A protein has these predicted regions:
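Acidic (Asp/Glu-rich), glycine- and aromatic
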Residues: 2-51
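Beta-strand-rich recognition/accessory modules
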Residues: 61-142
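Extended boundary segments
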Residues: 38-74
Length: 142
């Protein structure tokens, strides 16, 4: 993914079952070390310390004095986000996606974006990236 002030990647998770009726939640886990600070975006649109938010829409981690990492799960795919470990120098969190009953042959997809951005870009850039991703349609791939 490209943006004039950030570099990113998009991960697409696909799930299909051969069982008649199956529940198989998918979880992603991210751990970052040597971090300076971490914030989470609340459902009300406020950035709070990451360990105080129960169900984050996005996680923003300051990696250095100049670079931050932003992780977003598409809002139609996110079931839950849990910060599992948060200290002064590291953070670990888990997203639960696709926690649905699936019927045989049905394919479901979830999308996650990871962005590295300059700290001088401010929260306006994070809002732009989150809004753009939230309004995007999934690619029509198999």
């Amino acid at each position: 993914l490209e943006h004039r002030e950030a570099t990113g990647i998009e991960t697409i998770i696909s799930l299909q079952t051969d069982l008649l009726d199956n529940r198989c939640p998918i979880r992603t886990s991210t751990k970052l070390v040597n971090t300076l600070a971490a914030r989470a975006l609340t459902e009300e649109g406020q950035w709070e310390p990451a360990d105080s938010v129960l169900n984050a829409k996005a996680i923003l981690v300051q990696l250095s004095s100049s670079i931050s990492y932003l992780e977003i799960v598409h809002p139609t795919d996110l079931m839950n986000t849990l910060v599992q470990d948060y200290s002064e120098t590291s953070i670990t969190w888990e997203h639960t996606v696709l926690d649905l009953q699936l019927e045989k042959g049905v394919i479901r997809r979830a999308r996650l974006q990871s962005w590295w951005l300059h700290n001088d870009s401010g929260l306006e850039l994070t809002k732009e990236l989150i809004d753009r991703f939230s309004q995007s349609t999934p690619p029509l791939t198999t």
